[in-house]
């Protein structure tokens, strides 16, 4: 008599560990996060600069910028004064040569590569209390006023006085007029930014005295 073959059901291991429920963030952790956000907002409000602080910081800023640009600006002013003396009749060979030397030196001094103060200005960091007044743009514009505009103007002075004939002298005089116009437009752009900041903060100050 044949004995029927026994067929057992497939073996399924019994799970010994529990299914991990979905973990929710503890309430205290959510509360701590909310408190941190509130704290950040309160700190920002507490440290919002007053008009008095902004006015003081702006005066310091203008003093710094004026100090860094004044040697270049002074050279431009001196070059124009010497040129006007020559054009007014003090045109001896010595005076002409002196004016050329003044202008060449001034042009060199308006390059950040040759002027440590101007080089400092290229790396100037505006304080956070003055954020929003576009003073970074003003600083860059002052550097550009010096180099290349002020440098070009003084080289034009030297070139005009050193010209060997009337045609070249006229050519350099036209270049001087054109570059002086560029210099003055750049100064006007700087003054617009700085005067707006001065008015907004109530600072008792003026923009840098840029020659032109």
Q: Locations of the language-model features?
A:
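Short, intrinsically disordered, low-complexity terminal segments
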Residues: 17, 49-52, 147, 160
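Short, aromatic- and cysteine-enriched interfacial helices/patches
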Residues: 18-21, 45-46, 208-212
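N-terminal intrinsically disordered, acidic low-complexity segments at the extreme N-terminus
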Residues: 1-18
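Hydrophobic membrane-insertion alpha-helices, especially the h-region
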Residues: 24-46
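Short, Lys/Arg-rich cytosolic juxtamembrane segment immediately N-terminal
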Residues: 14-29, 50-51
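Intrinsically disordered, low-complexity regions enriched in polar/acidic and amide residues
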Residues: 22, 34, 52-53, 150
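Alpha-helical segments in soluble extracytoplasmic regions
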Residues: 64-212
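C-terminal region of N-terminal signal peptides and the immediate post-cleavage residues
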Residues: 39-62
């Amino acid at each position: 008599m044949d004995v029927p073959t026994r067929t057992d059901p497939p073996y399924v291991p019994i799970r010994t560990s529990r299914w991990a429920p979905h973990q929710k963030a503890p309430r205290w952790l959510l509360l701590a996060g909310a408190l941190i956000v509130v704290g950040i907002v309160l700190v920002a409000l507490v440290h919002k600069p007053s008009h008095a602080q902004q006015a003081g910081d702006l005066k310091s800023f203008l003093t710094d910028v004026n100090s860094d640009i004044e040697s270049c600006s002074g050279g431009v002013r001196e070059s124009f004064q010497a040129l006007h003396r020559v054009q007014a009749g003090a045109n001896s060979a010595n005076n002409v040569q002196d004016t050329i030397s003044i202008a060449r030196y001034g042009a060199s001094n308006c390059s950040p590569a040759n002027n440590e103060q101007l080089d400092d200005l290229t790396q100037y960091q505006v304080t956070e209390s003055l954020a929003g007044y576009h003073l970074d743009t003003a600083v860059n514009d002052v550097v550009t006023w010096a180099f290349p505009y002020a440098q070009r103007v003084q080289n034009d002075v030297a070139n005009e006085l050193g010209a060997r004939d009337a045609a070249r002298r006229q050519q350099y005089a036209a270049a001087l007029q054109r570059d002086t116009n560029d210099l003055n437009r750049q100064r006007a752009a700087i003054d617009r930014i700085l005067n707006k900041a001065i008015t907004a903060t109530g600072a008792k100050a003026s923009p840098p005295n840029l020659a032109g």
